[in-house]
Amino acid sequence: MFKKILLNLLFPKKCYGCSASDTWLCSKCLESLQEYQGEIPRAMNNRCDLIIAGQYQDPVLNKLIIDFKFGGNQELSKPLSKVIIKELDKKITINSLTGNNWGELIIIPVPLHIKRKKWRGFNQSELLAKELSNYYNWPISLK
C-alpha cells in the first residue's frame, strides 16, 4: 500500500494521449486511437474470426504496449484491455444481429516462456485475459 502511494506521488498517473491526470488512457483518447485499416485475416479455415484492436503505429497505443511489456507497469493492462473490449463489443453486436453467437467461449492467454516471464515478472497476455474475463464474465484457463 505504502509503495503504491509513493509511486503515485513520484510518478503520477496521466493519460498517454493528452496528459490528463488520474488515468492512463482517458475516454477521449481511447476513442481517438487509430483503428486497424488492413484486411483482417481469418483463422482455422475461416471458422474463427480474428480481432485486431488497433494500429500498432498509433503513437499512443505503441507507447502503452511498450511500457506494458517492457516497462513493468502492470496497471496498463486496464487501458489496453479497454482497447480490446472496444473492438470485441463491436464484434459481439454484429454477431448477435446476424444470429451468430459466441457459443461456449473460454479465454486462453498466450503462454510466455519461463525465462521471459521471470525477466518481466508477469505474463502480459494473462493480465489482459483476466481483465477480459472480469469484464465479460467469461471463463479463463491459466493452465
Predicted segments with their positions:
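Glycine-rich phosphate/pyrophosphate-handling loop used in enzymes and phosphotransfer proteins
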Residues: 1-143
